Amino acid sequence: MAENKFLDKINSPADVKKLSVPQLEQLAKEIRQLLISVISHTGGHLAPNLGVVELTLALHKVFNTPEDKIIFDVGHQAYIHKIITGRREQFPTLRQYGGLSGFPKRSESEHDAFGTGHSSTSISAALGMACARDLQGEDYNVVAVIGDGSMTGGMAFEALNNAGMLHKNMIVVLNDNEMSISKNVGAMSEYLYQLRTGETYNKIKNDIEGWLKNMEFGSDVLKAIRRLKGSVKYLMVLTSIFEELGFTYLGPVDGHDLESLLDVMQAAKKIDGPVMVHVLTKKGKGYKPAEESPNKFHGTGPFDIATGKKITNPNAPVSYTEVFGKTLTKLADTDDKIVGITAAMPDGTGLNIFAEAHKDHFFDVGIAEQHAVTAAAGMAAAGMKPVAAIYSTFMQRAYDSIMHDICMQKLHVTLCLDRAGLVGDDGYTHHGVFDYAYLRSIPNMTIMAPKDENELQHMLKTALDFDGPVSVRYPRGSGVGVALDTQWQDLPIGKAEVLRTGKDVCFWAIGSMVQTALDAAELLEAQGISAGVVNMRFAKPLDVELLREHAQSYGKIITLEEGVLAGGVGSAILEELNENKLLEQCDVRCFGIPDEFVMHGDKKLLFRDLGLDTPTIAAKAAAFVKGEEE
């Protein structure tokens, strides 16, 4: 990488403030080179960050963190913020075990005002800070940086509505690149398109300039407006949706023109009440492959800089996500009742495969998990077979809809939870470890988890043939590598599969932990310990008959789950055994995620730290059998 003229001297925002606009432009080039170089090795959110380099520099040039608060919605576009707030030298450790988080993290830096990872939270948090500031008689600026994709989330609208009513001094920077991960959908996206293209500006008053000149700080605002993309018409006085909500609207401004950005931010600081600054950026700017395919470089693994091609293992098994997408597509080929629903993640969930074949039966509702689930309930009530594919961590946002709109009415909705379990580099905001617990407590819910990618096919067919609420959860990444059946059978509801018989102890494992149980049983056999293995298949209902039999015949059971122990599958087994007064005959140990938020890092290292790797489980099982536990 070429020698840096300015970047190597940037150790805090104070160093950014010393630079002129031409120097900042050079710094932006150097930062882009660093982003491309590091992320090509570590993986990460490349395209979003390439698009906000100038914007982030302008924010830190104008505002004074940590006194002023800058909140990045989702936070995946905060890499530049990290680089210029004292973490430049650590940046090569991004998303690595023990290294920098890929998202803002309050414990990582005083400049990270608010931790983020999920969408559409920034305006609410910023408003809360502004209220706290005023109540405590303090004086600082609060800025929320939110993408147009996040603006499809209902929470953002709730916050805008409340902020306009409270009229607190705060700034919302709308980073408009026409993308979230996939192409944005919804009325707000259409509205922003009209703002970008100037189709709704016929109501602009001729006397705006005179009005501004007569108001306090008006000349500064006018100076900024004149730099806005196009002309003064882009100030929507009392006509834009943001003005109707009580915001002063400034924009759109070119998000890669530093002079324009600096001027508009300075002006926004001086306006009383909430301000919306509309910034137009290009996702992936500065790296041609990312500009041409911004969705592919939204979140990427390691890649070759010269070609932009991802560095992958050609021998890796097919992913669970792909198996899901292809299976659902094939099932829909012969059943026109099936519909697929996603919340702005068609590629991430595999529903892009389904959408290509069944366009009219595919619905991308935007970043709106609660709406997605209730819309699915409505479809089910009207006779369809909806499948809502949403990441496990994001499904948390739809909990009330699952309970109130699906399960209370016993509607036939299939919830497919991708990225269940530990996801690795994205860390605790994205680990999908709570779904067993939060779904198991809901009456009428059936919960399945496949031991491998082939069983996922059978479970999906089972779910669609079952008349009631069903959830199927499966992990991120490649499958186990088993052969895929071409004909699928319904699995008996609530029945487990005995994979291995033993005498001394039995593993009751579910989902991704079944293979770990089999491997641990092999290690135990080498020590003269005979271990059975059960593939639970169902977290709810349990195979009560088999469980009672094993409690009496083995006398020792170990549960394995890639989810939290509190309220999880192990808890379900303990509850059942206790209810049947079998805990006096059977000793149980539960292995899973402890009561903590798990950090980011390579999954193998995280499993080792949690004691969920095969050698540790085998060692603990041996000690359990021998009565040698510490």
Feature map (PLM): residue ranges:
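N-terminal amphipathic, basic-rich helices that act as targeting or association modules
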Residues: A2-I84, E243-L262, V275-T281
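Glycine-/acidic-rich phosphate or pyrophosphate-binding loops and their flanking alpha/beta elements
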Residues: D263-Q266, H298-G299, G308, S319-T334, ...
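Peripheral docking tails and interdomain loops at the edges
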Residues: P302-A316, G424-D426, T446, S571-E630
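Structural signature of the thiamine diphosphate
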Residues: V221-P289, H412-L417, Y436-T486, T614-E630
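Cofactor-binding active-site loop characterized by glycine-rich and histidine/acidic residues
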Residues: H45-L166, Y320, I338, T342-A343, ...
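Non-catalytic terminal/interface segments that mediate subunit docking, oligomerization
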Residues: K69, T281-Q396, S401-L411, G468, ...
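Long, well-ordered, tryptophan-enriched scaffold segments
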Residues: E178-F324
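Generic long, charged, amphipathic alpha-helical segments
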Residues: D364-V365, L518-A551
